[in-house]
Amino acid sequence: MFRPVVGVLALLILASSCKKEEAKQYKVSLRATCFDCLVQYASGPDRGRYDTLAGFVEGTDTIRETGTYELVMKQDEALFFRACRIWPDSGSFGDIELSAEGDIEPIYHAVPAQEVCGVINREVQFR
């Protein structure tokens, strides 16, 4: 009778000590401004979130579209945020601007109209 009780207690103690510690999560707000761009964003190894920013021409003004996105990151993950022009000749309609803020130190990246893609791909500093 004593051995099974000791065995069960030992298993309970081992199971509770093996509990996986959860990593702290951080919220990050992303913003991309571009004319006719494909936006891709993720944290860590995942690269599967996409959006398209169209923009439009109104009279003699070119209006770039802005997309905002929310991302949840863990401490050891890198931020991946990219916007690439769908049509190479759409560069004449303005720069590509990328920014990230929230529970991280703010990041801003802009590329001139001649560039095809703007990319942020790096480790971030959490607050």
Walk through the language-model features, giving the residues of each.
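Short strand-edge motifs at loop-to-beta-strand transitions and within beta-strands
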Residues: 61, 65-71, 120-122
